[in-house]
Curated annotation (Swiss-Prot):
PROSITE patterns: RIBOSOMAL_S14. This is Small ribosomal subunit protein uS14m. Its main location: mitochondrion. GO terms for cellular component: mitochondrion; ribonucleoprotein complex; ribosome. Pfam families: Ribosomal_S14. It comes from Marchantia polymorpha.
Length: 99
């Protein structure tokens, strides 16, 4: 397992752990009906959360190779691995088209 896959997995765990807290803080920060003092306080709390707990830091990677580009979200595998597995018949319901 490559280091990038391990790092990405740790980020995914952090995102899951802090997701509700982050959503709560963001909702309070963006609520214009609240006083600025409270909004600023929650903005500060939001900035104190771990940086890797943000969803934008998670990268879709192939679960077999760790390749970060051209990954099919539905299968979480890269186009290269997808082609190999599809030609072997390892993916259920996927077959080469012919007409």
């Amino acid at each position: 397992m490559s280091n990038q896959i391990i790092r990405d997995h740790k980020r995914r765990l952090l995102v899951a752990k802090y997701e509700l807290k982050r959503m709560h803080y963001k909702a309070i920060c963006q609520d214009r009906n609240l006083p600025n003092k409270i909004r600023y306080e929650y903005f500060f709390k939001l900035s104190k959360l771990p940086r890797n707990s943000s969803k934008t830091r998670v990268r879709n990677r192939c679960i077999f190779t760790g390749r970060p580009r051209s990954v099919y979200k539905l299968f979480r595998i890269s186009r290269i691995v997808f082609r190999e597995l599809a030609s072997k018949g390892s993916l259920i319901g996927i077959n080469k088209s012919c007409w």
